[in-house]
Design a protein with these regions (language model features):
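Single, function-defining residue in the core of a domain
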Residues: 1-55, 63, 72-73, 77-85, ...
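Short alpha-helical "recognition helix" segments of helix-turn-helix
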Residues: 60-67
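Short Lys/Arg-enriched helix C-cap and helix-to-coil transition segments
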Residues: 88-102
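Conserved beta-strand elements of the Class I
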Residues: 111-113
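Short secondary-structure boundary/capping segments
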Residues: 129-130
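Extracellular beta-strand-rich solenoid/capping regions of secreted or surface-exposed proteins
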Residues: 133-134
Length: 351
């Protein structure tokens, strides 16, 4: 039941951080680190990260010691403990908890998975500038994050964090293989920065459905559709080495496929063009329009991360700690949404 989801997430988190094998796998040096009974240990360190308040380390250390019923803990001790803890521990906790979400809401029997990215600034420090290129305009090292999000059930499912600029299409293709994303009866939703023939091929090979917004010049066939004035048409694409020559991400050749192109007119009078492999009989044009509108749920999710979880206000100055913050923020967002959903009264059906 959804009112128990937040509780299940907390219990799963406790199980993981107390598990000896989990601790050894995600401790930077298991032969040396966290071998004494000194606090904070591995469980306390992992618990600290999503619960900190983006305040000074000294104040956070004081609050943490009080909450954890420890005599005292210094900011330096917390920093050292975080350095001993690998960021992948937070990614696994986030993914394990995301898998517990109840899929209460579907779209005609399908889960919806929206894929999108965001860019942000990192602390302007020499060590980070070596790994994360500095944006000439902002003057700060930049990161590029990508996530898969269930907009109907308001849950982040998987995510990646890289230096910016990164190729969004490559990141999206990697994200499709995440354990909470692959193998599901779902419709994948993509904005116009993602479409590529290689991505379409991967989705087709996975046997999954998709809706993508494309530019008017995405493919020659799409350009022809735009000029024709048609509103919903099947297009046959023959993709060969000559056409692929300028593509950064390569599809396996030869590749022949069919896509459906749909024209959507916005209230502003502007037009958008969507490609999909959903059948017209089951998903007429109005359903395709509705599906793409639902993709905006991930924008709402990112807005929450920026303005409520403060995802860009990192509490660490090192890459390992910054990635800890990132995945801990996603975990916290999911936990908050689960708690809110569980507290809401059931909807009363109208006669």
């Amino acid at each position: 039941m959804k009112e128990q989801t937040a509780e299940k997430m907390m219990e799963r988190t406790k199980e993981l951080i107390r598990d000896g094998a989990f601790q050894r796998e995600y401790t930077e040096n298991p032969e040396r680190d966290f071998t004494r009974q000194r606090k904070p240990g591995f469980p306390e360190t992992v618990t600290y990260v999503p619960g900190n308040c983006r305040e000074s380390m000294e104040l956070n250390a004081e609050k943490f010691a009080e909450a954890a019923k420890m005599e005292s803990v210094s900011a330096a001790a917390l920093c050292k403990a975080r350095a001993k803890t690998g960021w992948k521990a937070f990614r696994e906790i986030f993914e394990e908890c995301a898998a517990l979400r109840p899929v209460d809401k579907l779209f005609q029997g399908y889960e919806l998975i929206a894929v999108d990215g965001m860019k942000g600034e990192m602390p302007n420090l020499p060590l980070l500038r070596e790994t994360y290129p500095v944006n000439s305009r902002q003057g700060y090292p930049m990161f590029h994050a990508m996530s898969a999000y269930d907009p109907l059930n308001e849950t982040f499912l998987a995510a990646s964090f890289q230096a910016a600029p990164a190729d969004e299409r490559e990141m999206a293709m990697e994200l499709l293989d995440a354990k909470n994303v692959k193998g599901k009866k779902a419709i994948r939703l993509f904005d116009r920065g993602f479409p590529s023939v290689a991505l379409i091929q991967k989705l087709e090979n996975m046997g999954t459905h998709f809706v993508m917004r494309v530019t008017a010049d995405f493919l020659t066939e799409v350009s022809g559709f735009v000029r024709s004035g048609a509103v919903d048409k099947l297009l046959r694409i023959e993709w060969d080495g000559k056409r692929q020559k300028g593509s950064k991400i390569k599809a396996n050749l030869p590749y022949s496929f069919q896509i459906r192109c749909v024209r959507i007119r916005l209230e502003s009078g502007e037009e958008e063009f969507l490609i999909t492999n959903l059948p017209r009989k089951e998903f007429p044009k109005r359903k395709i329009r509705e599906l793409y509108r639902l993709r905006w749920g991930i924008e709402t999710g990112y807005n929450y991360l920026k303005n409520s979880v403060f995802i860009e206000e990192f509490t660490s100055k090192k890459e390992n700690g910054i990635k800890q913050d990132f995945y801990a923020s996603l975990w916290a967002a999911n936990l908050t949404n689960a708690a809110i959903a569980g507290a809401m009264p059931p909807m009363i059906k109208k006669n």
